[in-house]
């Protein structure tokens, strides 16, 4: 039964690409409604697969917007190209190597990025997109439920970690709904969840060297059981560190995102040479 579902339109899901095709119409409708495409939008879909989200999104665009689809499986890219649509532009290649900023410049528009992401590239892709966030309106992604929980986690929770801090420092994150394995063919071994991620306005973000911020967060979470007095010992040589009022008797997972940002600002303003990320 699973194999039959996986051979939709003559294509067999390929494990090396982490392919699980969305087949539940109610879930598809819920995702498209959450995205709420507007006629003038420039959408980018990562991993369109057989087009479960692609075609409903194109219908909502109504011919006025554009949908760029990035597909690594060349057979699927060719399949979508053959079906043809005036507003659909196919890019056969790896989303991890795709230049989203260049596309935004070419379109003279900020991008709305969507996708049912292969689980094996979700974290690397999210970090790749951090460098492109000035060109992005929002992102709607289907992710492994555990990864979604880590991204949206609150301080002090079991899931709160480096991924939470790095992404929440740059985005407003909203976990929309969960999706069961039966919504896919073949069904994955885990549940999924849909997230909305909207970049914070640049004026609301501190002026930081974000590579140094990444190094700070990585150091903080390098040993979760140790308190920050030990994991961030190199940073405590910063002038006026104690005057900042930062409680380094806590563990990394107890510190809110805002405090990491304030700490990074203080370190940067005092010209401390942070370790390279």
Swiss-Prot record:
Disulfide bonds: none
Listed GO CC annotations: cytosol
UniProt keyword terms in alphabetical order: Cytoplasm, Methyltransferase, RNA-binding, rRNA processing, S-adenosyl-L-methionine, Transferase
Subcellular location per the Swiss-Prot or TrEMBL entry: Cytoplasm
Protein origin, superkingdom: Bacteria
Catalyzed reactions: adenosine(1518)/adenosine(1519) in 16S rRNA + 4 S-adenosyl-L-methionine = N(6)-dimethyladenosine(1518)/N(6)-dimethyladenosine(1519) in 16S rRNA + 4 S-adenosyl-L-homocysteine + 4 H(+)
One of the record's GO molecular function terms: RNA binding
Record carries keyword Cytoplasm: yes
Family of this protein: Belongs to the class I-like SAM-binding methyltransferase superfamily. rRNA adenine N(6)-methyltransferase family. RsmA subfamily.
Function summary: Specifically dimethylates two adjacent adenosines (A1518 and A1519) in the loop of a conserved hairpin near the 3'-end of 16S rRNA in the 30S particle. May play a critical role in biogenesis of 30S subunits.
Protein name: Ribosomal RNA small subunit methyltransferase A
The encoding gene: rsmA
């Amino acid at each position: 039964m699973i194999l039959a579902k996986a051979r939709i339109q003559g294509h067999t899901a390929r494990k090396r690409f982490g392919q699980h095709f969305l087949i539940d119409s109610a879930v598809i409708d819920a995702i498209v409604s959450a995205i709420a495409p507007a006629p003038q939008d420039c959408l980018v879909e990562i991993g369109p697969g057989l087009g479960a989200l692609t075609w409903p999104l194109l219908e909502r665009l109504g011919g006025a917007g554009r949908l760029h689809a990035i597909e690594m499986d060349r057979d699927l890219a060719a399949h979508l190209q053959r079906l043809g649509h005036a507003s659909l532009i196919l890019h056969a290649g790896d989303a991890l190597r795709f230049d989203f900023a260049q596309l935004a410049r070419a379109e003279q528009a900020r991008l709305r990025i969507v996708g049912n992401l292969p689980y094996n590239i979700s974290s690397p892709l999210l970090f790749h997109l951090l460098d492109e966030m000035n060109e992005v309106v929002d992102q709607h992604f289907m992710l492994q439920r555990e990864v979604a929980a880590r991204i949206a986690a609150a301080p002090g929770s079991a899931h709160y970690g480096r991924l939470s801090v790095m992404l929440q420092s740059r985005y407003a994150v909203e976990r929309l709904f969960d999706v069961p394995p039966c919504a896919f063919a073949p069904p994955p071994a885990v549940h999924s969840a849909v997230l909305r991620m909207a970049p914070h306005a640049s004026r609301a973000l501190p002026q930081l060297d974000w590579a140094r911020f990444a190094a700070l967060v990585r150091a903080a979470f390098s040993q979760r059981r140790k308190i920050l007095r030990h994991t961030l010992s190199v940073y405590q040589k910063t002038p006026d560190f104690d005057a900042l009022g930062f409680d380094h008797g806590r563990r990394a997972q107890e510190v809110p995102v805002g405090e990491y940002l304030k700490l990074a600002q203080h370190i940067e303003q005092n010209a401390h040479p942070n370790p390279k990320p």
